[in-house]
Amino acid sequence: MKKKFKIIFPILVCVCFIVIAFIIIFSVCKNIKDKTVKVAFYGLSQDLCQAIPQEFVDDEKIIIQYDFLADGNLDLGTITKKYDMIFAWNGEVTQNLSKSAEKIPAKILENIPISLRDEYCVPILLDHFEMAFKTDLIEKTQINPQESFQSFTDFLQESKQYVFSPFFTYGSDERMLLALTGSFVEALGGLESYKNLIELMKTYENLDDFCDIGLNENGLCYADVLNMLKIWPKEEIIHPQWTIANRIDLEVFASDNQVACFYTNLSEHRKLKYEIVSKFSAAKMPVVNEDIPHCLIAPSVNCVLISDNSNSKKILKKLLTEDVQTRLSDKTMLAPVSYRAEAYDSLADDVRFLAASCEGGVEPDLFNAVFQRDNEKMTLIANQIRGYLR
């Protein structure tokens, strides 16, 4: 027995040394490999592409390489081979990349609401497609349009005696046109209907192929929303030329007090003159049935960890800290996602609250969800919608 032990013990010691040496070599090699972090920014504005990297980890031992990729066609296979992390508007691109992404440690997600936590694709800033209601008309009509979808339409009807176009948005903007129709689908049918619409738009190439397909068990279909919008000009609820209107048209009508409610997103809201926005109160889209799950249509700048680079995780962890979130909100005027970060203003703070309290969390608008890499198809569908509404 002792003889066997004398033979086995040195062998075990050698094996242990080999294992330890292997671990050390592996660790050293990984540290060398992780020293360089390759980061992609896809489809983000110049402001965002400047603000986000300014908050990265300041460590001379880490080399960060950036690539700024424009909207449009993108080879996801190349992205997964070339980069360690990517920042993009949440949508078709991030959802596809997240299927093979590195899992984000739970510790990193602790600073954000449960409704926003995603182990593979985490938001760092929020936008929001909103309704803006004229505050003096809420008093005049004695109707709270935020209470329900019925209250919303009642408000528009009652506002006809005060303004030329109770409702307004600029339908010449393809993204805004699609977002509006998507928001109405969500308001009428909830999260399930909205997600089903996204899948139909991904599947079919033409409006006629999917507009009559049911989105929920009640038979709601995309055509129901389009038909509602089609009769609104005849009922004098919306300007007859709204599908070709632009943001300047909105400014003109709103400045002249001829709009009771307009639809836009937080980013575009920031571009409107103070004399306009000061007369309006921004809110989420009212819904028909509060008893079913709903989401907030709030485009979010998300991060996906493509590789297991340890320094990528350090960067992401820092971006979600209270101080950094406060600075990012100040620089971008978007909503922070951190619980305790200070928001740029009450509008951004409201978006964060709505996102945290919404049972279905946040979902991208139709552009990001479906057409992020296919602007040609987006233009085709948008033109078909305009034709349908004539």
Summary of predicted features, one role per range:
Residues 155-211:
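Extracytoplasmic/periplasmic solute-binding protein
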Residues 1-92:
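Conserved N-terminal structural module of periplasmic/extracytoplasmic solute-binding proteins
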Residues 274-332:
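Extracytoplasmic/periplasmic substrate-recognition and gating elements
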Residues 67-76, 150-153, 240-252:
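Short helix-initiation/N-cap motifs at beta->coil->alpha
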Residues 123, 296-298, 326-390:
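C-terminal capping/gating helix-and-loop segments adjacent to ligand/active sites or protein-protein/ligand interfaces
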Residues 87-133:
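Hinge/lid segment of periplasmic solute-binding proteins
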Residues 195-243:
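Glycine-centered hinge/linker elements that transmit conformational signals in sensory
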Residues 90-98, 263-279:
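A ligand-binding cleft/hinge motif common to bilobed small-molecule-binding domains
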